[in-house]
Design a protein with these regions (language model features):
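Short alpha-helix capping/helix-loop boundary micro-motifs
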Residues: 126-128
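Catalytic strand-loop segment that frames the active site of acyl-thioester-processing enzymes
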Residues: 45-51, 56-121
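Ser/Thr- (and often Asn-) enriched beta-sheet segments in non-cytosolic proteins
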Residues: 90, 141-144
């Protein structure tokens, strides 16, 4: 993680378009030219009137130069949820968290979830699955689960934060924090 006032550079590029989905990488590089943060993201092209996905046409993609995908761990689209969660809070979405699309900004879900991870400095990977949109003044039930997952390199500790509306099954977002050894 860069230190305060350290110069960094950020680069982002598209690496694939498929039906209504665009894939892109983001890399943060320190002042020595070393990659210190990498991200992989999926974006959906939406018709803002119908709120439905639309096909990415050749004309839409023409303005993007496709570059190779950054060599990083490839995660599945869905975060596997544990069976049991503990309800830790209920919060109301403030106006400041609403983006120009009229729903809670994607970045705000992560900032909110960070509040429920005991030691954020032990996190070495964050995965987010956005499921539905939270709106202004909507109450979000915050649930947390801590689980051990067997991986190739051994056991991993994950903190899973689930944010849901008041209705059963109305999950808005799930954030999975993989922790390093303490």
């Amino acid at each position: 993680i860069p230190k305060m006032f350290e110069e960094i550079s950020v680069k982002t590029w598209a690496y694939e378009f498929a039906t209504s989905i665009g894939y892109r990488n983001v890399i943060v590089t320190d002042e020595n030219g070393e990659d210190i943060v990498c991200a992989d993201s999926m974006w959906t092209l939406m018709d803002m009137e119908t709120k439905h996905p639309v096909r990415i046409e050749e004309e839409d993609a023409k303005g993007y130069e496709i570059e190779p995908r950054y060599p990083m761990e490839k995660c599945g689209r869905k975060i596997r949820l544990p069976k049991e969660f503990e309800v830790v809070d209920t919060v109301v979405v403030p106006k400041a968290d609403i983006d120009y699309n009229g729903h809670m900004s994607n970045a705000k879900y992560i900032l909110l979830a960070n509040e429920y991870v005991e030691d954020i400095t032990c996190v070495n990977r964050i995965r987010v699955e956005y499921k539905s949109q939270a709106r202004y003044k909507e109450a979000l039930v915050i649930e947390r689960a801590i689980q051990e997952i067997e991986a190739e390199a051994g056991m991993e500790t994950h903190v899973i934060i689930k944010m849901s509306g008041k209705e059963a099954g109305d999950v808005k977002a799930v954030v999975d924090y993989r922790l390093t050894e303490a």
